[in-house]
Amino acid sequence: MEGLYQTQRIKDLKDKMLSEPRYASIEQALIITKTYQENEDDPKIIQRAKSLKAALEKMEIRVEPEELIVGNRTAGVRYGVVFPESGSTWVDKEFETLPTRAQDRFNVHQEDIETFRKVIKPYWEGKSLEDVLNQRYGKEINKIAKVVKINQKDHAQGHICPDCVKWLKMGPQGLLAQAEEKLKICKEEQKDFYESVKIVMEGAKHFMVRYHDLIMDMAENESDETRKQTMIKVAKNCKNISERPVQTFHEAVQSTWFLFVILQMESNASSFSPGRLDRHLEAYYEKDIKEGTLDKQQALEIIECLWLKFNEIVYMRNSHGAKYFAGFPIGFNIAIGGQDENGNDTYNDLSFLFLEAQKHLGLPQPNLSVRLHEGTSDKLLKEAVRVVAKGSGMPQFFNDKAVIPSIQELGIEEKDARDYAIVGCVELTTQGNNLGWSDSAMFNLNKALEVALTGGICLLTGEKIAPDYGNLETYETFKELEAAFKKQIDYFMDKMLLACEEVEKAHIDLLPSPFLSASIENCMENGMDVTAGGAKYNLSGIQMIQVANLADSLVAIKQLVYDEKKCTQKEMLDALKNNFEGYEILRAMCVNKVPKYGNDIDEVDKQGTKWADYFKNRLRTFKNYRKGPYHTGMYTVSAHVPMGENVGATPDGRYAKEPLADGGMSPVYGRDIKGPTAVLKSVSKLDKTLTTNGGLLNMKFLPEFFKTETGIDKFANFLRTFVDLEIPHIQFNVVRKEDLLAAKKNPEQYRGLTVRVAGYTAYFTELADELQNEIIARTSYGDI
């Protein structure tokens, strides 16, 4: 948008945020532990509510004098939170190594370690989500760990889009009043739920008023009159929204941020997402613009303050989880554009202001997404392309033509499907009515193929980890191999679903979420917590990892072993067992003589589709513990690196322990040799119902491509092709290999360099060496 600029306020706040060191924080853990101890006899949901209220009343709050949007999750910026309710055992094991571990490091205070072990750890032993699950089902989960990663074992679920519109219209006071009215008429079994909502909304109101009081105290000592008046306005916003629905754009943005801070305090989970925020805030923006109390430059500055706040919260995982979710992805996903409930193209000034904010700041959060469809305006599309060209890894793009009809197959109403949003990385959701459990588990199809080839033996350790349905030497035909592979998928899927059910049960028992539930459709109506199935929709998503390697491997076996007989079954199996040492010629054939996924070759593309379809169709026959459907996704976050470490050599020529293909729908890097359009055509052969939980296609372009208006136009047309081919998702890195190598060598000089990892953006210099190398190795395109 012409004439808009980044203010000095924003530059100063950004510099200050990025310069502060990260620490692990036990502040909330101490408050929660004490509150639990004082309320041992309460029902769990009341205990949880009182604990959140105590944290809202007692945790240290801080305000920078220049801030237009206030509210902090921790006393310091980008602190990692110790959350003992979900997991304390791993913290105890890893506290000392947090500053030195390979990925996602945090500084620690020695006195915090001592306090944790003296005060916090003893109380939570055997009571945390992590410990309870380990007692109930840990052995069974560990048995399948080389093939399946079960998630949410030591942290709350998250991955949900609350009803922001309801929150803005009611605020904590309105929801408190609603809970009080429900308490007068509810059934006995619903009382604890409504009482818990009442408690947390009282806490939310108090939290907001605390900021009002602090800022007013600060304003009294402020000598700059302009700044003083701004501070008073910010303070009044906090007080106003604690008492009534929001009335102005500034209040609406402030209220939105408080919602997400409190959600984080309640659950300490990733991927709470605002959804279609340009639409949520539109009425307040238009009103203020019309009345002359706001202009576009002022609105942009408020938005950029919100963007900075999104970057102040990071998520601290255990070292194992940090490999799978590297770079602190917290998943505040905001979607702009797309269709309205009637199928019309929709965008507004805020859509462009959000893009402008991303262009100015280039930060990893929020995870900005653009919904595209056949009727998307050229104006919005080309502006989004110009932001892509800036190289921050955003925005990513979603395809209404693929998404809307596919998620309706899950029982989602058309009006809700048209209003879909994204949570976390690429996970599809409806807004304000869906607990999607979109990160339930990851299923390593390549490891399942490995044990089908070896008779259940792990190539890396030699141990038996699966049933023996035969091995490659015993399969006289390719069909026999396929039959054994199906049996291995079935075996691990059954085990996985039993584990997922146990995880859901434990969340219901231990981590009810009354604050979140108040903003989810049907929960307040039915007096049921969202974790227990109170939402309108109750899905569970499983990720298939990774069809590119799988398709390439199966085609290699079929062609070289069974069709052309270039090698025997024993030779191929021995080559895998020996990591191709002594079998270099065979590996060269696997790599160079066999067609590869990503080049628009039906034979290999359809092999990937065939197995993804099998997995999806079988999975869809099951229901989760909340009686909702299971469905599939195809995205890896950064799991393609650690999951690759668990897989031996594969028939596509990949060496043992090397990363699998990134993304989820992306080709193996270096094998997509026919250009980006061929990649699109390959991916389009994957049925769109395979990715109702989200699909991910990564591409990397050189910055030079975007230097001219012709390049911008060509790229916009490329995205139109993406829409026509009904591919659900696409995202881009725009960066030179030389810059990435320089950043590895001199990280301090490239502190602000962000890259697209897999569905999210992270600072390149904060990624572990293995993941940096994988990103550098991805195919780069200079033209379309």
Predicted regions and their residues:
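Extended, non-transmembrane alpha-helical coiled-coils
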Residues: 206, 210-213, 217
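Acidic, metal/cofactor-coordinating or nucleic-acid-engaging core segments within structured domains
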Residues: 224
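Extended, structured, electrostatic nucleic-acid-contact surfaces
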Residues: 216, 220, 285
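Extended non-globular scaffold/tether segments
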Residues: 195-206
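Conserved catalytic cores of very large enzyme subunits
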Residues: 1-195, 227-233, 237, 241-784
